[in-house]
């Protein structure tokens, strides 16, 4: 599936911020751009039709995901495809660079942890 231009541009911003964390590599997951730590994906461009264009999928536990969606539903959401997966979908245009950095840090810690609680 070809990425939309907005998704590529948004991921360039994500990559610029996210690669500042220790051990981060740029790769792909399911053919889309992703950031990984220790070989584990912590964020990617979601391609399932339940994800809106210009979104980012970030791994985190279910509790934190639900808190974010409740606090800022115009920024964070989930789709049917992602409901049972420990991640949140974020509308990149709604995030400042500081918010994006904090969000990526959450995903980075989640993926890097040896044991994950969900």
Spans of model-derived segments:
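Charge-dense, helix-prone N-terminal extensions
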Residues: 1-118
């Amino acid at each position: 599936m070809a990425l939309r231009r907005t998704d590529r541009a948004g991921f360039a911003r994500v990559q610029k911020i996210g690669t500042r964390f220790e051990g981060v590599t740029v790769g792909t997951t399911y053919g889309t751009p992703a950031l990984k730590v220790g070989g584990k994906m912590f964020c990617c461009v979601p391609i399932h039709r339940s994800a809106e264009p210009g979104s980012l999928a970030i791994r985190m536990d279910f509790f934190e995901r639900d808190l974010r969606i409740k606090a800022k539903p115009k920024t964070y959401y989930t789709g049917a495809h992602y409901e049972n997966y420990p991640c949140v979908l974020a509308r990149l245009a709604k995030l400042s660079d500081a918010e994006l950095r904090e969000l990526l840090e959450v995903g980075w810690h989640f993926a890097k942890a040896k044991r994950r609680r969900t």
